Amino acid sequence: MLQGPDVGRLLLDRLVAEGVRYGRDFALVRITVPLGSAEELAPTFGRVLRDADVLVRWEADELLALLPATDRPGAERAAERLKAAVDGAAVQLGAAHWVGDTAFDLLARAQPRA
């Protein structure tokens, strides 16, 4: 089930807080999809994510895969798996690993690219 943006913001803020307090790694993949296709593509993305990962709607045409306990190479591998799962679909992905920055800065570093 695709979670909404309010849940996404709450979970992202929690991951940042846990990172600050406990030094826990996490990453995210920002996924831009064709407008109106998020619900259709979400189950496919969900099948390639780990059980601990969460897929949320961020904007009308954007999803986030929140990846707890994930380093930079792990985030890049997750992005590759997500892209391969929808081979041929017009999606753009950007991955970023949390390095002590704010959620805003992390999202900016994960700006999707073709």
Regions inferred by a protein language model and the residue ranges of each:
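Short, acidic/hydrophobic/Gly-rich beta-strand patch recurrent on exposed beta strands
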Residues: 30-32
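Alpha-helical scaffold within the catalytic cores of cyclic-nucleotide enzymes
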Residues: 12, 41-49, 75-90, 111
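Short regulatory alpha-helical coupling segments
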Residues: 2-24, 34, 39-47, 110
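A short glycine-enriched loop-to-beta-strand structural element that forms part of the catalytic core
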Residues: 27, 57-68, 88-113
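Catalytic cores and conserved motifs of cyclic dinucleotide signaling enzymes
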Residues: 36-43, 73-77, 98-113
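Conserved RecA-like P-loop NTPase ATPase core
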Residues: 15, 63, 82
